[in-house]
Curated annotation (Swiss-Prot):
The keyword Chloroplast applies. One of its GO terms (cellular component) is mitochondrial large ribosomal subunit. Belongs to the universal ribosomal protein uL16 family. It comes from Cycas taitungensis (Prince sago). Residues 1-21 are annotated as: Disordered. The keyword Transmembrane does not apply. It is found in: Plastid, Chloroplast. GO terms for molecular function: rRNA binding; structural constituent of ribosome. SUPFAM superfamilies: Ribosomal protein L16p/L10e. This is Large ribosomal subunit protein uL16c. Gene3D superfamilies: Ribosomal protein L10e/L16. InterPro entries: Ribosomal_uL16, Ribosomal_uL16_bact-type, Ribosomal_uL16_CS, Ribosomal_uL16_dom, Ribosomal_uL16_sf. Part of the 50S ribosomal subunit. The gene is rpl16.
Length: 138
C-alpha cells in the first residue's frame, strides 16, 4: 500500500474538506479516460490500491493506468479503552484528501467500453460518488 517514505512531521491536524478542486488535479493529463470524484472524502491507501488492482485486472495487459492521487496525510488513533489525556495517538494509516472533481485514475490504450467497465468496478470500491470522464479531443 502507498505511504510517504519520509515526512517533515509525524502527525497532522485533521483539517477541513471545504471547497472544490479547482485548478490542480481535475483535468485529464496522461490518458484518454478517467474516474473523477464528485464528493469530498478521505480515501485510504487500501482503497486506492483496491481500485488500482480492479482496473489492472479488468484491463489485462492492454493499456496503461495512472494513479493520480497519493495518500500523504497520516491519521492517528488511540488504543481502545484508553483514558483521556496523555497526548495524541500514533499514526495508524494514510489517506489522500479528495475534493470534488479530482481525477482519481486515468487510463489509456484501451477501448472506451473496456475503460468504462474497469472504472465502474473501481468506483464500487471508492467511498464516494464518482463519474467516468473522457478527454476532450484537441
Amino acid at each position: 500500500m502507498l505511504s510517504p517514505q519520509k515526512t517533515k512531521f509525524r502527525k497532522q491536524h485533521r483539517g477541513r474538506m471545504k471547497g472544490v478542486s479547482h485548478r490542480r488535479g481535475n483535468h485529464i493529463c496522461f490518458g484518454r479516460f478517467a474516474l473523477q470524484a464528485l464528493e469530498p472524502a478521505w480515501i485510504t491507501s487500501g482503497q486506492i490500491e483496491a481500485g488500482r488492482r480492479a482496473i489492472t485486472r479488468y484491463a489485462r495487459r492492454g493499456g496503461k493506468i495512472w494513479v493520480r492521487i497519493f495518500p500523504d496525510k497520516p491519521i492517528t488513533m488511540r488504543p481502545a479503552e484508553t483514558r483521556m489525556g496523555s497526548g495524541k495517538g500514533s499514526p495508524e494509516y494514510w489517506v489522500s484528501v479528495i475534493r470534488p472533481y479530482r481525477i482519481l485514475y486515468e487510463m489509456g490504450g484501451v477501448s472506451e467500453t473496456v475503460a468504462r467497465a474497469a472504472t465502474e468496478i473501481a468506483a464500487y470500491k471508492m467511498p464516494i460518488r464518482t463519474r467516468f470522464v473522457t478527454a476532450s479531443p484537441v
